């Protein structure tokens, strides 16, 4: 009886110790429809890391940057534009994983009466400020020879963009899913981020982590990267087969807020990376993308200063 009681006590103490060591992590995600959402839906990250995970949906990268800066969020999903702003403001974060290289999943959708870029002059175009689509909009206007001041650019979050479009308050918006799908129902795509990237202004979707959290819990960050990369590989290996599996489509539709019929087109709209490609991008190109984006945003008056190097905000150690 004494041995049994002692074992019970030891088990209880071990459980208490485990509870004390358990890691709580808040992850900020956005509504892009991409294969790694399957891992989110299946709670793979929590299972592999042993952490208690709180997934929180945000409408834009700018709000995620604020949450990261305050410490409310430890891991977050950002586009390259809010990333460049965060790095320029010295927010203590680092990129540890690429979610995707953005393509036609982000687009400038306008009223059907707008047939050419010049028709944008004097029109009211909405975009979430300091987002990848804000950067892409400014880059597109520059490519077309249109000054930002010639267009009324308004700062709206995606849900507000949908409402403003339905009321007729705006003539167009550069945005992502599910808002881009809502606007396309009775609008037209004037350009998208794949084309803008070909014009010299590519955009990325990345995962970042607070540096203090990464230093304290490297195994948790590594588990996150592994869960996301593993979820993407079946799609990379055979996109058509992956997209024909109903459970994949339903999971992405639920987390992205788009109709299931729209999911395949959105998934195909971006480029996803193998582990080897992740390492290659994180050891040079991502730093260059931050520099290029920050320099462009400085030209547009969106950031006050630009550094010559942002490599301290990028790491490949969690994907190797």
UniProtKB/Swiss-Prot annotation:
The induction annotation reads: Repressed by sulfate or cysteine.
Q: Where in the cell is it found?
A: Periplasm
User: Can you quote a single GO CC term?
Assistant: ATP-binding cassette (ABC) transporter complex, substrate-binding subunit-containing
Signal peptide span: 1-22
Instruction: Spell out the molecular function terms from Gene Ontology.
Output: transmembrane transporter activity
Q: Which SMART domains match?
A: PBPb (SM00062)
Transport is among the record's keywords:
yes
Report the superkingdom from the record.
Bacteria
Q: What GO biological process term is on the record, naming one?
A: taurine transmembrane transport
UniProt keywords (A-Z) are: Periplasm, Signal, Transport
Q: SUPFAM superfamilies, alphabetically?
A: Periplasmic binding protein-like II (SSF53850)
Q: Name one Pfam family in it.
A: OpuAC
Tell me the NCBIfam families matching this sequence: PRK11480.1, taurine_ABC_bnd
Per the similarity annotation, which family is this? Belongs to the bacterial solute-binding protein SsuA/TauA family.
Q: Which PANTHER family match?
A: ALIPHATIC SULFONATES-BINDING PROTEIN-RELATED, TAURINE-BINDING PERIPLASMIC PROTEIN
Its biological purpose: Part of a binding-protein-dependent transport system for taurine.
Protein's name according to its UniProt entry: Taurine-binding periplasmic protein
